Amino acid sequence: MMSNYLSQLISQHKDFPKKGIVFKDVLPLLQHPNELEGLIQGMSTGQIFESSDAIVSIDARGFIFGTAISMKLSKPMIVARKPGKLPGELITHSYELEYGQNSLSIQKKAIENYQSFVIVDDLLATGGTAMCVSEMLKEAGKDITGLSVVVELGQLNARAYLPFPVESQIIF
């Protein structure tokens, strides 16, 4: 887990995207390159990456961190995108958000040469998004070695319901 200083760089927006939600925004971290580099270093050294063949990053903020980790570890990155964003044959699943419902898709061809994956996202809240990606990978006969996130909302206890290890850098 990272320092308290990093958690201070996460901005919080009350009642966004709907009333009752306090949105944790990781984007201000990008304005601090030294801290971002340390964050990526911390995320990249997680044990879950050692036995993975590739990374699946979740639309859209997960792409930022997944790309950096992919480059640092020289591991391929696959994207899980929201509806209507990917061409070709897809695996698609729906999921529940802390504040609604959505779906994600992965290109079948993108994962065919890899067996084990780490899922990367910016934030773990209810775990619905991570489980959605996990279900798509399982449907394709793939393994999940873990989930790596910048922020975890600890009070929601999503990690207790996920069937794979979770590595988070900041817990609120």
Swiss-Prot record:
Keyword Protease: no
Catalyzed reaction equations: AMP + diphosphate = 5-phospho-alpha-D-ribose 1-diphosphate + adenine
Gene Ontology CC: cytoplasm
A molecular function GO annotation: AMP binding
InterPro entries in alphabetical order: Ade_phspho_trans (IPR005764), PRibTrfase_dom (IPR000836), PRTase-like (IPR029057), UPRTase/APRTase (IPR050054)
Subunit annotation: Homodimer.
PANTHER family, per the entry: ADENINE PHOSPHORIBOSYLTRANSFERASE
Protein name: Adenine phosphoribosyltransferase
Record organism: Prochlorococcus marinus (strain MIT 9211)
Gene from which the chain derives: apt
